[in-house]
Amino acid sequence: MNSTTTKNVCGDKWYLNLDRPEEALKILVFIAIFVVRTLLHYLMKPLGQPYLTTDFAIGLILGNIPRFRGAFSGPYSITLNNIIEFGMICHMFVMGLEMNPSVLLRPPTKDAFIAYTSMITTFVLAFVTTPFLHYTKTSPYIFSLALSLMASSTGSPILTRVIANLKIRKSDLGKLASAAGVHTDMISTLLYCFGFIFFPTEKPLARPLHRFFRALLMFCLFLAQVTFTSIVSPIFLNWVNNENPEGKPLKGSHLVMSLAFVVLICSFPTWPPESMYNPILSAFTAGLFLPNKGRMSKWIINKINYLLSTVFYPIFFFWVGFIIHMRNFDITDKMAWVRFFSLLGTVIAGKVTGTVLCGLLLGYHVPETASLGLLLTTKGHFHVYLAALAIRTNRVKSTTGALIIFIIVFTVVYSPFVVMDIIKRARKRVPVHIMALQWLDPTTELRILIGLHGPHNIGSTLNVMEICHGGREPGSIFYATDMVELTDEIAATLKKGGGAGQSNDSVTVTDRSVTEMRESITAAVNGYGELRNGQGVTVRRMLALSTFVTMAHDVCGLADELMVSIIILPFHKRLNPDGTLDAGHAGFRHVNRKILKNAPCSVGILVDRSFGQTEEAWRPGASMGIAIIFIGGRDDREALAFAAQVARHPAVKLKVIRFLEDKSSQNAQKRSSILNRASVVDQEEEMKLDDECFAEFYERYIAGGGRVSYMEKHLTNSSETFTALKSLDGEYGLVIVGRGGGRASSGLTTGLNDWQQCPELGPIGDVLSGSDFSHNTSMLIIQQQRTRGQLEGLHDDFTIL
């Protein structure tokens, strides 16, 4: 029995019969495209190249293989052209839907200024040069207008993808490039829409009056589409979104109505046969003025983008390769190469000149604005389509059109390298120092910023200073920082003219309650500084006077400026007379959380139950029992580094308690699937770092009869971890733990955070600070410096402009 699939698409001439080799070859072409595409993109991923580059390379090769070209000749080429046109309609619709036309009605922002300036300089330069190079013999000035507009535009989807892939979209330059690219793309495509109305690509009508009425008809249809879409679509889509809330399946009838509505607004300007309005540009206009917020719009964007990226774009570039036909490429055509280098130079020079001039007015660095200009030269699929269409309609020679497409693709090829150069320069200009105890150079002084909410923190602050110093060489600097909320009453008492001991020397605080509080704290910490004078201890006073909204930012800025290794903050809850903790201060809790998230160094939160009331560690004969719990992970390693500072003090009796997971237990075996889901390489690297760090500590402070004692506990699950923590109840005055609560793969803490009251303390710290734990044991929860972002040596939101 013959397996024959018959589909009549073009009269009686196209029948897809898989029994015939030339028919099966069509299927083989598409399979080859998708397979080779995946492999080639994987190989080019280290270069940061987007799919457009690999798709073009594959399409150019496969589209020029004679057997493949023969399989798609004749009526099949018509079908392929129809597929490409439909795909471009979808591409332009979703591109418009992702844009926001309301920015055109607002005062121009920096990105708009850069977009306008770079567009104008490139357009003027291109329009001055292109008419003399004779790209086409039909309507040369109209073609020069279109080519100049293409040269001045930007392919925002490709540019945004390159910026996101190389992880600079949160930086100031990344944000500016993305916004300016979208603005440029939107303006240039709208100008294409207007240009098509007055200069249609179809054969012009003989009489000027007829041409005028056709242009008037298309303009009226354009205005009707914009008006109808802007007014009706928000009402309709808001109703659909309200009827289909998040979390519930989309109703089929509403989905069908929404798609029908989209098809209606995209197509109705093309209904009158006299209009000849371009359906691709009509789809862009419809998408542009549709609301892009809401569930239905997001659903449409996601689905269409998925189909475009996985199915359409590979076929599109096969069509482009088919159109180019390298056999017709005349490499000896000198004039074509003059056009090539002239247009490439015009695109680069125009964009770079415009952005540099605008950047100078805005106060940006020239190298960065030049890089921004190079990024804005990036073109996209729409520009490739226009160039290929010019070849197909014989408006340009095949060689000239192919070289224009090569220029478009070349602007995409070098964009990732421009971004890499930006990152390289940012690393030099914006170095990020690793400020953590674990990597502290032993030959440098220890710098610690200690926050105080009031006089009740004096005792714990002095004890922290003492145990951290421990006779350390070359010494320690402690920045005792008062964290004071800036209320309206306090703001009314501020006077210009700095006061001594304040971090902000532009004002003096005259509020009586604040000055009395600061005087009592200053007397205590200065007294300790005088006591340790000559022993390498330096105490300095700081003030963070801010609202709770900005206090975390000020403290982090102070820590960065002072280059401290760790910030130690008081817990937001205070000790009651009965030994319990009160409900806490919501403002200081907010500050602690923000500092944990944004601090440039390590952070410790001190839960003071009795630490500030115990015998001062510097008194003769004083003794203080301190324990550190080590499970594993970066925070536990930082806690161990803090314990190493504490271990030097003669009055401290330090005990290291290491919780080890029993690998032979059934629980550990069940968790192997979790390890498989997580990055096994990362987990093994973490375990290696833990073992190396602990071995170094053990050899230095525990082995050979050191003063630090050691205990291991082999546990199987979080329940046994909780029991082990309860067994420490009341034995130590201070317990040091890492906020992370061990490695992500550790089963010893899994489940402990299900009922967390204070997530900022981590699973172990939250248990130890609970109301059912000892009222005599204080906790210090430590978090190692978080290097935000995925760029090595840089934060995601680095600033370089």
From Swiss-Prot:
Its main location: membrane. GO terms for biological process: potassium ion transport; proton transmembrane transport. Pfam families: CHX17_2nd, CHX17_C, Na_H_Exchanger. The chain crosses the membrane at residues 24-44, 77-97, 113-133, 140-160, 179-199, 216-236, 252-272, 275-292, 304-324, 343-363, 371-391, 403-423. It is a multi-pass membrane protein. Keywords: Antiport, Ion transport, Membrane, Potassium, Potassium transport, Transmembrane, Transmembrane helix, Transport. It is found in: Membrane. GO terms for cellular component: membrane. Specifically expressed in pollen. Gene3D superfamilies: 1.20.1530.20. GO terms for molecular function: antiporter activity. May operate as a cation/H(+) antiporter. Belongs to the monovalent cation:proton antiporter 2 (CPA2) transporter (TC 2.A.37) family. CHX (TC 2.A.37.4) subfamily. This is Cation/H(+) antiporter 28. It comes from Arabidopsis thaliana. The lineage of its organism: Eukaryota, Viridiplantae, Streptophyta, Embryophyta, Tracheophyta. The gene is CHX28.
